[in-house]
Curated annotation (Swiss-Prot):
Keyword vocabulary terms for this entry: Amino-acid biosynthesis, Aminotransferase, Histidine biosynthesis, Pyridoxal phosphate, Transferase
Cofactor(s) the record lists: pyridoxal 5'-phosphate
Lineage: Bacteria, Bacillati, Actinomycetota, Actinomycetes, Mycobacteriales
Gene for this chain: hisC
Function summary: Aminotransferase that catalyzes the conversion of histidinol phosphate and 2-oxoglutarate into L-glutamate and imidazole acetol phosphate. Shows lower activity with aromatic amino acids.
Protein name in the entry: Histidinol-phosphate aminotransferase
Alphabetized InterPro entries for the sequence: Aminotrans_II_pyridoxalP_BS, Aminotransferase_I/II_large, HisP_aminotrans, PyrdxlP-dep_Trfase, PyrdxlP-dep_Trfase_major, PyrdxlP-dep_Trfase_small
The keyword Amino-acid biosynthesis appears for this protein: yes
Species per Swiss-Prot/TrEMBL record: Mycobacterium tuberculosis (strain ATCC 25618 / H37Rv)
HAMAP family: HisC_aminotrans_2
Catalysed reactions, semicolon-separated: L-histidinol phosphate + 2-oxoglutarate = 3-(imidazol-4-yl)-2-oxopropyl phosphate + L-glutamate
Miscellaneous information on this protein: Was identified as a high-confidence drug target.
Source organism superkingdom: Bacteria
Name of one Pfam family that matches: Aminotran_1_2
């Protein structure tokens, strides 16, 4: 569309003042031979899963003229069954809420427990959607730094929570982009001092060597919310399904802020089909962990500094110019992630042949390594 012969831009629109100058979130989506930038499970769904999804969606399509189950009860019951089996913690549909990806879950949580006059704290570098969603809900964003190895210094974190008294505390475990998990004793230290809601983001929980924070929900019912996704280990990124685990009162709060019929019939049917094949899908986790360790050892041997990871990716450096190094990988046909940390890049653990290509390129690029000043900042 044009105005007086000139294209209409954002400057011509009555955009909110706090959105001016901002850039949209999103990893590059490029057609390259090796894509290791968005932490997906590289193993495609099995034929049995694909057939089940097709059959389930076909059955759901019969009623596409009707709205879906607005509370997604059957899906939530299936998620509760999966989590009970995985964690050993007895959960019911009343403990689960589901939405279109964990980002929508996080947005709903901030709509309910954040907002104008309230604040949220995160320990950076961490998942960059936490501050973006905070900004979008007019929740004041507070940053506290991690240790030099990008791990969570629990004493520093506790002091920051005590000092700033945030309404929402974000704790990513494993953390993205550094990969470290937080132990249950350290989580308890933070939960003990959190004045409001603590959100433990377990997007990569299936890869973690630590027990899930789900085991603490009963002990901290008015404080703890655990968020998860089917986009990572579950190999369901295209299906867009996230969920949370909490006391039933938190689900009641979600009902106050969710949009009506937010989960389509198709999404619910496809996700339930995927859950029926969880054992087959998650059998790839052990192989991905083994590949992650192989990549870590190889990068270390090349002279890179590799942050020990408990997820399906590695953060590595130290580059004199990380953006330039990122471009060199891209020129080699390999897409990884510049997460905004000076001197560092992040690479998803791919299939063995993808990791081989990544390591061959890394061996060539390793000659550019020099020490850099570390500066933990917010990262995608």
């Amino acid at each position: 569309m044009t105005r007086s012969g000139h294209p209409v831009t954002l400057d011509d629109l009555p955009l909110r003042a706090d959105l001016r100058g901002k850039a949209p979130y999103g990893a590059p989506q490029l057609a390259v031979p090796v894509r290791l930038n968005t932490n997906e499970n590289p193993h495609p769904p099995t034929r049995a899963l694909v057939d089940d999804v097709v059959r389930s969606v076909r059955e759901a399509a019969i009623d596409l003229h009707r709205y879906p189950d607005r509370d997604a009860v059957a899906l939530r019951a299936d998620l509760a069954g999966y989590l009970t089996a995985q964690t050993g913690i007895q959960l019911g549909v009343e403990n689960i809420w589901a939405a279109n990806g964990s980002n929508e879950i996080l947005q709903q949580l901030l709509q309910a427990f954040g907002g104008p006059g309230r604040s949220a704290i995160g320990f950076v570098p961490s998942y960059s959607m936490h501050p973006i969603i905070s900004d979008g809900t007019h929740t004041e964003w507070i940053e506290a730094s991690r240790a030099n190895d990008f791990g969570l210094d629990v004493d520093v974190a506790v002091a920051a929570v005590v000092d700033r008294k945030p309404d929402v505390v974000f704790i990513a475990s494993p953390n993205n982009p550094s990969g470290q998990s937080v132990s249950l004793p350290d989580l308890c230290k933070l939960l003990d001092v959190a004045p409001g809601i603590a959100i433990v983001d377990e997007a990569y929980g299936e890869f973690s060597s630590q027990p899930s924070a789900v085991s603490l929900v009963e002990e901290y019912p008015s404080k703890l919310v655990v968020t998860r996704t089917m986009s990572k280990a579950f190999a369901f990124a295209g299906g867009r399904l996230g969920y949370l685990i909490a006391t039933p009162a938190v689900i009641d709060a979600m009902l106050l802020v969710r949009l009506p019929y937010h989960l389509s019939s198709v999404t619910q049917a496809a996700a339930r089909a995927a859950l029926r094949h969880s054992d087959d899908t998650l059998s790839s986790v052990a192989a991905l962990i083994a590949e992650r360790e192989r990549v870590t050892t190889s990068l270390n041997d090349m002279g890179f500094r590799v942050i020990p990871s408990d997820a399906n990716f590695v953060l590595f450096g130290e580059f004199a110019d990380a953006p330039a190094a990122w471009r060199r990988y891209l020129e080699a046909g390999i897409l990884i992630r510049d997460v905004g940390i000076p001197g560092y890049l992040r690479a998803t653990t791919g299939l063995a042949e993808e990791n081989d290509a990544f390591l061959r390129a890394s061996a060539r690029i390793a000659t550019d390594l020099v020490p850099v000043t570390r500066s933990p900042v917010g990262a995608p």
